[in-house]
Regions:
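Negatively charged
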Residues: 4-245
Length: 245
């Protein structure tokens, strides 16, 4: 009887337009936590959706949310569909999928033109290798730890506009499979590359044209990146004050 009741509720929810419209990050995070408590893997949460007239997680209207930091933090079973979320207003995605160890869903069409902070966005998202090649990251100032321990990530990000980025600490730290082309990244504004490729064991891509004249910290940039043997002889390191190897 309980099974059929839940099934009926689920069917009804699918037929009802999503109405949940969070206005801030706190409201979104609270709703995500409640939904995933019921159905951790996909966010269908039929009881939560019906009782609050919210609809399923993937259908929520996130148009007004600016702060998406930690929304799926440690959601280690989640791999639901959030491809239809409107994230155009978002400015902060710090740790959004940090610890979401199974997440690998399609977010290729997200509009990120206002995002400035991608700290630890996919930290420890060790299943993530989805297509994010067309993301607009032109206003992002920090890529610190973005793919830290994203151990299988190796997708194409060659066309990203990184001209506003000023910090790349731990960006690919322990991104063990990463060896994608980042040769054309604009790094002219970057001032710190501490442990950027630390233990990125597969990495050996061309970085010869990177502009690092503003960088002051190169501590362990290629520490334990055992395959890296690229030509960086023309790098301008005049401002570097820390360069442990």
């Amino acid at each position: 009887m309980i099974f059929w009741l839940l099934l009926a509720v689920f069917i009804c929810v699918k037929d009802v337009a999503a109405t949940f419209t969070p206005t801030n990050g706190a409201a979104l995070k609270a709703a995500v936590a409640a939904c995933l408590k019921e159905t951790p893997s996909d966010g269908s949460c039929p009881l939560f959706a019906a009782s609050n007239s919210n609809g399923m997680l993937g259908e929520w209207k996130t148009d007004a949310v600016k702060d998406m930091s930690d929304v799926f933090y440690k959601s280690d079973s989640f791999n639901g569909d959030v491809s239809h979320w409107n994230v155009a207003a978002a400015t902060n995605m710090n740790g959004m999928f940090d610890g979401a160890t199974r997440f690998n869903s399609d977010i290729s069409k997200w509009s990120l033109s206002r995002v400035t902070n991608m700290h630890y966005l996919f930290h420890d998202a060790n299943s993530f290798n989805a297509d994010i090649s067309s993301w607009n990251v032109g206003h992002v100032t920090s890529l610190d730890g973005m793919f830290f321990q994203a151990s299988v990530f190796n997708s194409d990000i060659s066309k990203w506009d990184t001209s506003s980025v000023n910090s790349m600490d731990r960006t690919f730290f322990q991104a063990f499979m990463f060896n994608a082309d980042v040769s054309k990244w604009n790094t002219a504004a970057v001032n710190s590359m501490q442990t950027t490729f630390y233990e990125a064991e597969a990495f050996n891509a061309d970085l010869s044209k990177w502009q690092i004249s503003a960088v002051t910290d190169l501590q362990f940039t290629f520490g334990r990146a055992t395959r890296f043997n690229g030509d960086i002889s023309k790098w301008s390191i005049g401002k570097v004050t820390a360069i442990n190897r």
